[in-house]
Swiss-Prot record:
It comes from Aquifex aeolicus (strain VF5). Its EC number is 1.2.1.38. Catalyzes the NADPH-dependent reduction of N-acetyl-5-glutamyl phosphate to yield N-acetyl-L-glutamate 5-semialdehyde. The gene is argC. This is N-acetyl-gamma-glutamyl-phosphate reductase. Belongs to the NAGSA dehydrogenase family. Type 1 subfamily. It is an enzyme of class 1 (oxidoreductase).
Amino acid sequence: MEQTLRVSVFGATGYTGIELLRSLLTHPHFEVKNLISQSYKGKKVREVLPFFSNTYISEIEFLEEPVEDYELAFLCLPHEVSYEIVPKLLSQGKKVVDLSGAYRIKSPKAYEEFYGFKHEREDILQRAVYGLPEVFREEIKNSDLVANPGCYPTATLLAIYPFLKERVGIESVIVHALSGVSGAGRKPKQQFHFPEMTENFFNYAVEKHRHTPEMEDVIRRVYGREVKVRFTPTVVPTSRGMISTVYLKSEKLNVKELFKEVYEDEIFVKVVDEPPQTKWVLGTNYCFIYPHYDERTGYYVIISAIDNLGKGASLQAVQNANLMFGLAEDDGLLQLPVFP
């Protein structure tokens, strides 16, 4: 029996909202009913997003609040806004995939330090399931609130998960990740203005990045003990794409066999024999991983590539929603990369 599930997208005109719609419009079971946008309320989709003109949503108007009934909400909103909306949606019996960071970390204290607001909803923090399907698949299936991971944590955690799963000794984790400019969102910012960003790249949030406690929180939950992460992010002058290079020391093992065994049955994670490129994943939900052991230094070097808007955000959100409703995990996610 064909199942049709009605969907509302909050924050539908940001980059993650637009990427989400690209998947939802080809999804066999999800039907978009409400598109929420404070910036474009009252305007039709074809006026704001003309590339969706030939789709069934072209005449839908952007709203302040949903008017049609629905079962599933995707939140592509600022953290503080999601923080307020999630309890209301749960009380209405909706299932929620939240793409913000409002409910990702189990410790409320981390939010004051890294997000700048006081988190007073510990009950919902504990209720939320971290939406990394390759790690928390069974929990996601039984959840009504999934906290969709950040882009950097997705690329990094998939790069180290086999070590965590097998409980091999890890001393510390060093991460250097590079991201396209779309990771900064659609709102204009001077440092991402074309004349200043083109032929330029730079590190940021070197002292403190909000994705660091997110990574450490998941590592602690999966691995069973604390592991510190030294994380440095870099913005590069591309629209989208992410490469995460992870360095760690551990006991000697056949790292390629370990990764191939752990990810053997995963649809969207591919273990490869050469360093991956962002072009391989552009516009997709895939993650390509190259694990390597450097005999000279004794470091494991694991390189992962994702699309920061795909597996790093919106397409992973669809993967999570599929699991929440018992659908095929790859429904709406069969996009092939755009190349070159």
